[in-house]
Structures are given as C-alpha cells and as structure tokens.
C-alpha cells in the first residue's frame, strides 16, 4: 500500500449508506407496531418502555430465539417474507405459555453483504409478527460482517420482553390428576426440525418448489409461518383456569410437555384424536422416519398443549375455536410415578 492509497469502510465490505437506506425503508412499518407504553422512536441508543399501569405486581418475562435452519431453506428458495413472523412467533409463544403479555421485541440481523431488499422483507415480517402478537418492535441491530457469512447469507435472532401479574404466572404447579389436555393446531412444522427436513429433501431428490402436495407446492407447506397464539391464549387465560401450557418446539412431544408437568404426573396423548397434516406424512414417508422420531423432532400438527380442569375443557375449546384456532381434546393428565412423562397411544 502506497502513501496515496486511502481506504474506506465500504472498501472493507461495510456499506453504511445501505444500512441507512434500510432504516428509512422500515421506519413506517415499525411505527405501526408501537404500543402506548413505548417512549421515543427508532435511533436511540436504547429503547424505553414503561410498564402497563393495569399490573399491580408486574413480573417481567424474557425470551430469545432464532428460526434454526428453516432460514437456510428460505434463503435457498429466495423466500424471505415470512421468516420474520417465525422469529417473533418463537419468542412470543414462549412468553405467553407462562401467562405473559408480550411488550416489546428487538431483532438482530447479521449478514456478509447487506441486501436492503432482503433485509427489509425480513423486517417487514418481524413487524407483522409483532402486530399479530400485540408487541412493539422497538429496535434492533443490523450487522454487515464481511468474512463472517458467505455473500448475502444472513442469520436472525429475536429478543422479547413481556409482563405477567405475579399472582397469575402459569408454571404448571396446579396440574393435577384428571386435567384435560387441549391441543392447538399448528400451521406446519413451525420453526423446528428443519435440519431433518433439509436432509429428507436432499435424500429424496425432490424440488420443493415443483413438488405438489395437496394442490400447492411442498415449499409452501414447509415455509408456512409459525402460528402466533398470543391473543387467543391471553383471552383463554382471562376466562378459564389454565394450569399449564406447553409450546411444542425443538424436542416435540417427548421433551416439551414434561417441562410443565409437576412430579408424579403423566400426560396421556390420544393419537387417534387428530390426523397429521399432510406435510408430516410426506416427511415421514420420504425420510423413512420412525413414529418416535417424528414426535421427538416435529410438532406433528400440534403447536401447543394446554392443561386445564376437565369441567372447563368444553368452554376452553369453544372459546379458542371462536378466536380462530383449531382446538380439540388431545388427552389427559393422570397421577403416575413413572419415569415416562408422556405416553402417546
């Protein structure tokens, strides 16, 4: 390098102007997610948010998540419009199972080379997820890191904070023998199991964009955004004595339901109470995946499982269906000291 050479940040692969253009693109949609508790706008060093005044003893609940390798599939298929919904869903659904109302959300978007159109599409999806869950998108970080990611590949992470009344925290401690388990239908594989999904696609040699499943491309089934249950579940909690809620994510039935069960209880799942959506049948057949592995990896059509008193089950199902969910009795709780916390029969 001679004395006359003058390097810029852009020469190193970081385009500040592109980052500024992205902020300008997303300001409008971010503003739509604003809640009355939010103070200030985008661009500050930190986001300020007051607690809603209706809470007497507010407890903050936080969560963070990503979308796993579903993102790789979305990048391969050049479909970025719903991955942001997935990101929000994975965070806010984890909050609401504890009874928490999501307050605000932040995102982290990292890439090797910032493509403003792609990033704007992703963040539009994040804003849509925030609108669906009543959560304010208060800020984020866009990191252009040449040498860390290949080309325009990117990764996303989400961070959410919610609030719940201390006396109304749902922690599973009230789960008891005889409780009914109510299922909420999923919209597809949601955001879990996609390393196996991609392996099945590779081994089977199919093209997800041209392979038809129930009259639409397989890709549409696989990239269907994760369902956000927040508003329906909050309405349910306000009307029914909910004992526990499990969000069926990584680990499927076997790993997630036990997380909300107290000692000496067992969940009995009636496998005949629902039919798997066709995408799960396709995955099992194309990948020759065992039944046990399916329930361990995928939600198999069940996004959440709710435990509540048997006397309130019908009321709960009617309320949830009225809110647009597909809910049904999927099983019950029984007293047991068995090490097997979940039985699917």
Curated annotation (Swiss-Prot):
GO terms for biological process: 'de novo' IMP biosynthetic process; adenine biosynthetic process. Keywords: ATP-binding, Cytoplasm, Ligase, Nucleotide-binding, Purine biosynthesis. Its EC number is 6.3.3.1. CDD domains: PurM. Gene3D superfamilies: PurM-like C-terminal domain (3.90.650.10), PurM-like, N-terminal domain (3.30.1330.10). GO terms for molecular function: ATP binding; phosphoribosylamine-glycine ligase activity; phosphoribosylformylglycinamidine cyclo-ligase activity. It is found in: Cytoplasm. The keyword ATP-binding applies. It catalyses: 2-formamido-N(1)-(5-O-phospho-beta-D-ribosyl)acetamidine + ATP = 5-amino-1-(5-phospho-beta-D-ribosyl)imidazole + ADP + phosphate + H(+). Its main location: cytoplasm. It is an enzyme of class 6 (ligase). The keyword Iron does not apply. Pathway: Purine metabolism; IMP biosynthesis via de novo pathway; 5-amino-1-(5-phospho-D-ribosyl)imidazole from N(2)-formyl-N(1)-(5-phospho-D-ribosyl)glycinamide: step 2/2. GO terms for cellular component: cytosol. Belongs to the AIR synthase family. This is Phosphoribosylformylglycinamidine cyclo-ligase. It comes from Klebsiella pneumoniae (strain 342).
